A protein has these predicted regions:
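Glycine-/charge-enriched secondary-structure boundary and capping motifs
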Residues: 1-150
């Protein structure tokens, strides 16, 4: 899927122009190879951590099938595939609902999947559910929490 038009529309509607600082749309992460956590971590500044709640979406059947038939552990699926999340928009919490509305109006499945806050000293204790400094970028971190919705 190509997200460029929807992303541009979101920036223009919420930020009022094509970018800048201290604006509600902060970043986009196109989730391709390398999985959701690694792709999201590299668009976050160092010292910040996204907590992604797995129960905010259901895995598309194809990913469940790959896991089951291929005996691929969830951790490997998460480090390799997008698991149904093709694009993440990082926005200020105050505009989350408006962002979702703009994207849904554009025909994009959209939902709030988590929060962003300061990286905590104990976050790395989450093991495989924690990613920091991914894909050669010394950026932020992502903690994947919970179980996927049924």
């Amino acid at each position: 899927r190509i997200y460029s038009r929807a992303c541009l529309d979101l920036v223009q509607r919420l930020n009022g122009h094509d970018g800048g600082s201290d604006l509600p749309v902060r970043a986009f992460s196109h989730v391709t190879g390398g999985g959701l956590a690694a792709n999201l971590a590299r668009v976050l500044p160092r010292g910040l951590m996204a907590t992604v709640e797995r129960d905010t979406w259901s895995l598309p059947p194809v990913f469940r099938l790959v896991g089951e038939l291929g005996r691929v552990p969830q951790s490997d699926l998460e480090r390799t595939l997008n698991l149904g999340v093709g694009m993440v928009a990082v926005v200020d919490p105050e505009v989350a609902a408006k962002s979702i509305s703009v994207l849904v109006d554009a025909g994009i499945d959209a939902w709030e999947m988590g929060t962003i806050g300061a990286l905590t000293d104990d976050a790395a204790a989450a093991g495989l559910d924690f990613v920091q400094g991914a894909k050669g970028v010394d950026g932020g971190a992502v903690l994947m929490r919970g179980q996927y919705a049924a």
